[in-house]
Amino acid sequence: IEELHWDKNDIGCLIFVSQTPDYILPATSCLLQHRLGLNSECYTLDISLGCSGWVYGLSVLSSLLSHGNIKKGLLLVGDITTRLGCREDTSYWPLFGDAGTATAVEYVEGASDMYFHTATDGSGAEAIIIPDGAYRNGISKESLKIEVDTDGLNRSKLNTKMDGMDVFAFAVSKAPKSVAALLEKLQIPQED
């Protein structure tokens, strides 16, 4: 904010994307609004997404800014996914880490629109899931036990369970189609 020479009172929106929020309640975006010293008129929103989270967050932020009612917005994306994996799960550690980004977006009259292709397919939820710890399956003594899972790896029901092949297959089949759909929508040849 300082490097941009932005007045904190001009920031009208803060979106926080994470699957590892500070608390169940309140929303982390509200806490960040306060910690950053943004005014109480700042629109805040939490989005719970992983890999696609930055793109989804940017699409929401750009939509909020597109009419010029909000002039400046922040997109904060961060996860501490190392806390979600079991230290004994050798399939998890090479793929996940802790990271965060901050993206500042400003409305400029006459600037080009931002275009996105977003889609959702919840049918593969079992391919990457933390079975216990939320409201469908709360925390119990059974949740804490580290056991050998059906895939032969050690983890508790509070750790991320991932079918790497299913996640990989999803990524390599869906991502290219999403890019192609966006290019088609914008009438840009794929060769370009």
Each language-model region and where it sits:
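Short beta-strand segments
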Residues: 17, 48, 73-79, 105-106, ...
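Phosphate/pyrophosphate-binding loops at sites that engage ATP/ADP/AMP, CoA/4′-phosphopantetheine
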Residues: 1-12, 178-192
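Condensing-enzyme catalytic core mediating Claisen C-C bond formation in acyl metabolism
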Residues: 89-173, 177-180
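Flexible, glycine-rich active-site loops centered on histidine and acidic residues
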Residues: 66-99
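Short glycine-rich or small-residue beta-strand-to-loop segments that form or flank ligand, phosphate
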Residues: 13-19
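Non-catalytic structural scaffold of enzyme domains
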Residues: 60-61, 69-75, 80-81, 173, ...
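Conserved catalytic cysteine-centered active-site region
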Residues: 19-73
